[in-house]
Structures are given as C-alpha cells and as structure tokens.
Curated annotation (Swiss-Prot):
Originating organism: Nitrosomonas eutropha (strain DSM 101675 / C91 / Nm57)
Key words, A-Z: Amino-acid biosynthesis, Cytoplasm, Histidine biosynthesis, Lyase
Protein's UniProt keywords contain Cytoplasm: yes
Claim: Lyase is one of the keywords in the record: yes
EC number: 4.2.1.19
Lineage: Bacteria, Pseudomonadati, Pseudomonadota, Betaproteobacteria, Nitrosomonadales
A GO BP annotation: L-histidine biosynthetic process
Protein name per its UniProtKB record: Imidazoleglycerol-phosphate dehydratase
InterPro entries the UniProt entry points to: IGPD_sf, ImidazoleglycerolP_deHydtase, ImidazoleglycerP_deHydtase_CS, Ribosomal_Su5_D2-typ_SF
Associated pathway: Amino-acid biosynthesis; L-histidine biosynthesis; L-histidine from 5-phospho-alpha-D-ribose 1-diphosphate: step 6/9
Domain of life: Bacteria
GO cellular component, as recorded: cytoplasm
First-level EC class: lyase
C-alpha cells in the first residue's frame, strides 16, 4: 500500500499527518479548526484516501499557521506516498456541484509546484473561519506535494458551498491522479522518463 506519515514541529505548530492512497475514505481529524476538519473529511471521502491529522497550533493568535502547516505536511505525505510515480495516471480533474455552486479542480502530479486559485468567496468568513486560509492551505500543499493545481469556482452564492465543492472536487481529482493505470503500472507517466 502507498502510505506515508509526516510530523512537522515548529514554534507555531505541532502536526502529525498520515495518508493511505489506497484507503477507504476514512478520516480521523483533530486539527483544532472544526471547519478545516470538515473540509479535510471531504478530501478523504471523495478521494477514497485514508487521512489522519492531529495538530496543535497557536490558535490563540488565529488559524493561519495551523491551516498552512497542515497543508505543508499533507503535501509532504502525498509526495512520499506516491514515491517514484510509476504507473499513476498523473492527471486528475473533477467538476463538483453543490446546489447553486460549481467548482472545477485540475491536477498534474508533475513534480513542479504551481497553484492557480480562481475563486472569489461571497463572504470573508465561514463561521469563524477566514476564507483566505483556503488558498493558504492549497499553496502549502502544492509547494510540498510538487504538483500543479488549478482551482476554479465557476458559480456560487454561498461561501460554505463554494469551499465544500472545491474540497470535494480536489478529493475526486486527486483520486483520479494517484490511481494506478494497469496498462502502464511500471512506467513513469512522462516522455522524460522522470517526474
């Protein structure tokens, strides 16, 4: 099985994450940020990835460091779990609606970090969660997973729906990208021969 665990300790956060790419969509989440836990659960469930996250952060300041550092640690774990990338589909995409909302996510496990985040949330906060932290999470993830990620919210009036459809689409696109293609299970999915 393709699994990895990462521990990241800084003066701001103490985080341990574990990922199983060949899981059943189970999640054990204790980030200290309830809305983030709800979003991470979407990745696990829709990505069919088992995900464990335990974090303690400087939440007395705000959730920024915790959210960003969880993104970093999860990106590192994904990069380790996919290893040399032999046999993976490499690319993944998903359109996910949620009532009035529609989001598109496209992934390339290219070895080159890049994020295009095209979303204008209808509110600045969801409950007490600053929506700017969603982009911070994905930026940390992308930088350490070494992936190209395009996120586009194509329609939406409810900020919670916008966020949730993005995370669901990300989970489904990631599931597609990390799936092993049985026709090329011993090949790197690149004409360069390396990713």
């Amino acid at each position: 099985m393709r699994k990895a665990q990462v521990t990241r300790n800084t003066q701001e956060t103490q985080i341990t994450v574990a990922i199983n790419l060949d899981g059943q969509g189970k999640a054990e989440l204790d980030s200290g940020v309830p809305f983030l836990d709800h979003m991470l659960d979407q990745i696990a469930r829709h990505g069919m990835i088992d995900l464990n996250v335990a974090a303690k952060g400087d939440l007395h300041i705000d959730a920024h460091h915790t959210v960003e550092d969880i993104g970093i640690a999860l990106g590192q774990a994904l990069n380790r779990a996919i290893g040399d990338k032999k046999g993976i589909f490499r690319y993944g995409h998903a359109y996910v609606p949620l009532d009035e909302t529609l989001s598109r996510v496209v992934i390339d496990l290219s070895g080159r970090p890049g994020l295009q985040f095209n979303t204008t949330f209808t509110r600045a906060v969801i409950g007490s969660f600053d929506v700017d932290l969603i982009q911070e999470f994905f930026q940390g993830f992308v930088n350490h997973a070494m992936m190209t990620l395009h996120i586009d919210n194509l329609a939406g009036k409810n900020a919670h729906h916008q966020a949730e459809s993005i995370f669901k689409a990300f989970g489904r696109a990631l599931r597609m990208a990390v799936t092993i293609d049985p026709r090329c299970d011993d090949l790197i999915p690149s004409t360069k021969g390396v990713l």
